[in-house]
């Protein structure tokens, strides 16, 4: 699946993983280093036949995996978490090369381990609670029991912004539910797969039901053609293609797509709190987060003071160039994204927006970097207020009344997340309840990850479909639900069921 300097990486114990290694004779795909812009890695995509063979092997192993008690799957997943912990240095190094950032890459294995162990703690009780047994409320002589049957094979297509974490966020609960999983990460950031696969191989029971295939869109299509359920995280245009491909096969699909998340800052908000929350919510990870804040609505009475303080703080944010171990934010991971953000800035300035600090991306050592960029005098005719940005841009717009603020916040085709910062929690809740989005942070921004295992949320509008990847639904969505019914009385005699006489 992966072809860096050495031509082969297969394990003889992993036939379903190794099939694509024969592809060394075919063309490889170049992978660019986001810090230098140079190609320093290559991947060899599997053929459609390779993916089909991989899927067949996973399916064969999934039957025993699903039949085992959930406690067995929990134990296996805990072993995997232990192996990731042991190999975290190599994984972090690979993801740092993928993304051009050090701190987040260093924390990535820890976040995945936290997720695996956390879901391992929760899964047995979630599944037990979902197993219902009782008597019909319509016909009391009918008893019933429910049964949960996992989808045999999950296909995951994950994005480039958080390569390792977003490749496992759906697969972890699915594996605990009893599915097998095949994951296709983005071809933009594939380096982490090699050290992560080493950890999977060290847990033999897991290696039978989990693997990665690395390739482009053709690999993704082959994956969809061979699985029973799909989880996709990425852009709306690609998500639409994935949904159409799944619809043709009548298989369920879960889409977590883009956002244009708003924050409302009220007249009563504390400016220190508000500017700290907005700055982190907009520029963390260079703004390359699906639930990053991308629209800021500030009451007109505090607008100028808010902007002044925000600009002051934004100018203290440093790039991690030339030393990746210093600074606050890294380069654009994907060069095409930098061009999209630059085009939005050009459009905004043409339409009258003012850049208070920052500006367009700049080439530093071959990497594309952008300083936190604060815009004022923006309006909803501008692309920067309508289209997903995915960069460290902070457009600030005035509002007069709370009703106007809510109307502006909801003037979007998206509905992923949002935030409200106010003088009190009650005031923030009042406004947050009116925002049409799945996860609303109050008195801060981007809090969604904190409740990953605790509360459910769905994505509104074009930000997604298929249900919640959070809370109990994160596991239960991977089950098909059966009902087994027993009649405790004698079956009705068909000979006694006659047509009614005419009225």
Walk through the language-model features, giving the residues of each.
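Short acidic active-site motifs
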Residues: 50, 218-222, 404
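Short, well-ordered beta-strand elements within core beta-sheets of diverse protein domains
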Residues: 39-46, 61-67, 155-156, 263-265, ...
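Residue-level signal for inorganic ion chemistry
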Residues: 37, 73, 95, 178, ...
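Rossmann-like NAD(P) dinucleotide-binding subdomain of oxidoreductase/dehydrogenase enzymes
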Residues: 132-273, 399
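Structural signal for hydrophobic packing residues in well-ordered secondary-structure cores
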Residues: 62, 66, 81-88, 92, ...
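N-terminal Rossmann-like NAD(P)+-binding subdomain of aldehyde/semialdehyde dehydrogenases
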Residues: 2-142, 316
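Conserved C-terminal structural/oligomerization subdomain of aldehyde/semialdehyde dehydrogenase
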Residues: 36-42, 350, 362, 369-503
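ALDH superfamily catalytic-core signature
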Residues: 40, 229, 237-379, 403, ...
